[in-house]
Amino acid sequence: MRWLRPAGRRREQESVSGHLGPPAGAPAAPETPTCLPDTTPHPAPVVCSADPQLALESLDPRTLRLLWRQRELEIQALRWAIQNGEDARLCHILEEVAGLPPKRSSHSQEKLLQNQVQKLIQELKEQKERAQWEKEHLEERLLQTTRTLQEMEAELQNLQKSCLLQLARSSWVGRMLRSQTGSVEVVTAETLMDPSDLSENIQAPTGEGFRLEDVDWNSVARRYPNLFTNMEPSSKQKQPRPWPQLDTGSPESSGKHSERHHKTVEWGSLPCLNTSSSGGADSDSSSCRPGLPSFVQVIGHPPRDHRASSEQALVQAGSYSRDSEDLQKTHSPRHGEPVLSPQPCTDPDHWSPELLQSPTGLKIVAVSCREKFVRIFNPSQESTADLSGMVLKQLVRGFPERLYRFPPGTLLAPRHHVTVWGEATRSAKKPLRASSSREPVPLLSIRGCATLLLSPKGEVLSEHRIPRRETPAPRVFADGTDLSIDRFPLPEAGPGADTRKPPRPPRPLRKGRVREPRVSRRRPGTRGLLPPVSSGKLFHAREGPARPENPEIPAPQHLPAIPGDPTLPSPPAEAGLGLEDCRLQKEHRVRVCRKSVDRSCPLVALSVQNTAESRFGFRFLSCLPVTADTCRGA
């Protein structure tokens, strides 16, 4: 039938835009289809048939329902064409044919954007958490790296100290303190140096080796109790002064060991200090002449009281007059090894009348041939004396025999003194003769022998003369192994001895103590033990056993008592000492700082033998290094 043809076309339109029609279950419209006006762009199909025989009522319900849907679709198409135009309609048809998704509305686009924002926020949160975790991980790694770096720095510092100590052991970088007992203590120069005391206009020496800047002088004082002493205050001060904090500075120094005990003096600049200075050997080979080999040390501590210092000087000059009267030839080109150590002064009121006044105030206060030292004192209360270029000269019958020139930069603090040490010049077994041309002239206190202190211009600043006196050859460590510094007198010689022990009894008790308790320690073929009383008196009985009945042997003296202890009895006067010497021996009191020793510190290597045997076959107990001129028993 003709009227069914447009219906097939409309069914195609319904399939194309079926979503615009009513639902499938909608009831059919009751009105009959009529001819629609031609309002659409295309010619509308004519539903009515010219054949009157055909009526709509005669159609079945299904056909009517299809016709109704076709009309609805036409109405919707007309409305859409009116709203959007022909082009929009064609675009929509093309999109539907191509299967493209329909255009989203503003609501759907906003929802999509919100979903995207939420996704981005979630991703940012995850990235933030990941970054926080990475930050914590990096901080932990940084902390571990910092700890590892600190451990490596500590290990490096320990290695530096160990290397410095090993260098001090194997060379003359550090100073070696050796006593007659075989004890050896190595103290490096850097350990006793405090850079805070260096003056601004004085440059610190550029020595080789490691610099240790973290030096605590209180710990140094506890570490080296034998290097620091404090004399008893004067009678004007009733209460003792507290132990001062040792705040000193010193240059680095190093000496080089050469054959036949030759030491080349190598100096650095010394700081100008009002309190004290300390140091060791320094590397400056140009500061010493090659003709004056030596091993020089500069050690110092705060000034002591006038009275205590004068007592010490009087004890040295009175009780040990036999030694102090001997002329010391300060330096020997082959064996001389002077050691320079500034120390607190001696009282100028008790100086010998033979001492001369000098424009600079420097004075030679003591010369000992037996102990081989010359002591120079700076009596000034404020000014620091400059010893640079000054010369110590010893004349015998008007001819120079010994010569020592102070290195550049040598400063002497006010109320301090320096001690120039020399080694033995001849063997104890085979004394040298004065006529020998190949060996140094033996140290003899002969008439006309004088010790002069000359300025760099040659002016005589101080002169010290001693009457003629023959002295025996040095008997203790004449082979050059006794290298001690003038630093401390010890009340006791043993390493673990009690410093507050009362003085030893007279000769009868000492003889019993020497002969009875030490018999078990003898070895076959060794001689009897002697007490370590003096480096100069120790081997007086070298040719045979002890002879207590021999009146030529001087009576031993007791070590000074501890100051501030009224319970300790004063030593009794002995037969060989005068009243003046006994009085000086009682007044000479020393305070020694002895505290706990930090053995973990690698700055000091202290090796103490149980027993030590000298080249003469004698054995003596082990003790810490002592200075023979200030801590002698005889």
UniProtKB/Swiss-Prot annotation:
Residues 350-468 form the LTD domain. Keywords: Coiled coil. GO terms for molecular function: structural constituent of chromatin. Pfam families: LTD. Residues 322-337, 540-550 have a biased composition (Basic and acidic residues). Residues 228-237, 310-321 have a biased composition (Polar residues). Residues 276-287 have a biased composition (Low complexity). Residues 502-513 have a biased composition (Basic residues). GO terms for cellular component: lamin filament. Residues 106-169 form a coiled coil. Residues 1-44, 228-349, 464-575 are annotated as: Disordered. This is Lamin tail domain-containing protein 2.
